[in-house]
Amino acid sequence: MALKDVLIDELRDMYSAENQLVKALPKLAKGAKNAKLKQLFSAHLEETKGQVERLKKVFLELGEKPTGQHCNGMEGVIEEGKDALEKDEEGASFDSGIIGAALRTEHYEIAGYEACISMATTLGMAKIVKLLNSNLKEELAAAKKITVAGGPIMKQSAAEPEAPKKPKTGKEKYSAMKSKEDEVKAAPSILDRLAS
């Protein structure tokens, strides 16, 4: 597979990721308790729609269709965001979970755009690099805005009393079981040494 083919695959992944976010951001905006977060997510929705349009221009420049690939990574990150929205938390603690999910989303996109820009630069695709850099700059700015807005929210959350432990839901039990399986697969020898 040539580098251009890899780039096209990566771009299709980003196109899918951005389209998934167009659907997810209104839910984050609606779910957030903090007015500043609501506003940030709503504003970023409009930016994301613009990013989708820029990606369409990239594909036009390449003479390729943008569709045909689903971004499983973004689907997983969005699923974590849905989990944050379903938490039985209140106020700043609830919003802290949403902030974490939003930052994971932004950094996933940042990594994707940086990879695409590197490939397009290597291939000498200046117009495409310019379009992708516009998207990257917006993602970097969005991550910074979320981090800045999140600072006071997290401080407020840290000051809140810890809630009493509740029984785990079925989803949380399943997640804990999968986490344990991941640990065993990733580092069985280390776990064996710790157990002995």
Task: Tell me the role of every PLM-derived stretch.
Residues 1-196:
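Amphipathic alpha-helical hairpins
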